[in-house]
Amino acid sequence: MIFAQITSSPVITDFIPLSLLATAEEEPAQADGSLILASVLLSLVTIYIASKIGGELCSRINLPPVLGELVGGVVIGISVLGLLVFPETGATAEDSLIMAFLQQTTDLKPGAAAAVFEAQGEVITILSELGVVILLFEIGLESDLKELLQVGPQAAAVAVTGVIAPFVGGTAGLYYGFGVPAIPAVFAGAALTATSIGITAKVLAELGRLNSKEGQIIIGAAVIDDVLGIIVLAVVASLIKTGNIEVSNIIYLVVSAGAFLVGTILLGRFISPFLVGMVNEMKTRGELLLTALVFAFALAYIATAIELEAILGAFAAGLVLAETEKRKELEEQVVPVADILVPVFFVCVGAKTDLGVLNPTVPSNREGLVLAAFLIVVAIIGKVIAGFTIFGRPDINKLAIGVGMIPRGEVGLVFAGVGSASGALSPSTEAAIIVMVILTTFLAPPFLRVVFPETAETEVETSKQEGS
């Protein structure tokens, strides 16, 4: 500051060339574009290796690969190796092994490392956010609106209760019991609403129960749960943007999200035939995929413009295009795009999570451990309660239905990722949500095997005896 005041004096500037004064003052080093690209490429190499190793290990023990991608991110992230760290977590260029490697193998100077580190973090974060947009588009594309509308009242009751009970229990418990601020408490409560249909469906198929009464109710409820969960996520993320948690604002956002989703679906029925016809007239490569992505990104932008979340627009686009004759073909073409971008999202969620805040040997970390334990209990009880909302059906295994709704899986990780990106969650709350997602995903398969003790063969024999 003193140097700047001296050099700005008219007397000094009359005798010293301005070019010398300009170089004399300390200027921040500029990041070289080629070095930023090199750091991003090295980050992607690290991300993809971690995602494949983690995914392969989990798939071999009958767990969802996305869980392995998350754990892979934790290993290479701030919690363990420090290969992939981000400025928003409080890390600097000195904490990044990738920056250290670049300084050893390129002409990256220590003075420019900070600028390259910041730029690298921004690029990877944007790719991560694009990955979750593609993921929600893919989920929408795989959803069946007709199936959603045909789901019976029993599945609907299970789904609605399975969203409300953990959301209210988690939010109220964190806010009143632990003194967590309102918006983080609401977001953590919202993360408890998710259900991973893929994990439960796989276990039910292995047990021969997928087509049982309980299996059909679980699958139907999980489909509704996905839609309700995404609406809840969009509303809560919008609350973070506005910073206003008044009842009137919540009602406005809920109505806006619902109206946007319904309006897009209704309007899409008129637009989709035009899009399909346009695709049929095109002769260039990628005509279907690019047209679909234009539609998805446009709706994602519109959702963002009206203070909702981009993922809601992408999900709505998937729902609309799922009703066209191009659905199967589009599903196949989206997979490679998802394979490139979605792992970036899941690995980054893990990499940004500091599990060190849950270290029990540090007294100040015990609050985070208690939060994690509380979220796990509410996550399990809230879904189990939902199974007992089916009345007048003593022949149905209600406990099995509730247990089938427990795993959070990739949907829970989407909540954690969006919460992390928003900056609304404290490190302990974010880590507690991640632990909740991991443990509910791990616990659900063995729990299902306990509440469904009979094998498929036993079930077939029982049905034969009833028939005779």
Enumerate the predicted regions with their spans:
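Transmembrane helical cores of multi-pass secondary ion antiporters/exchangers
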Residues: 2-468
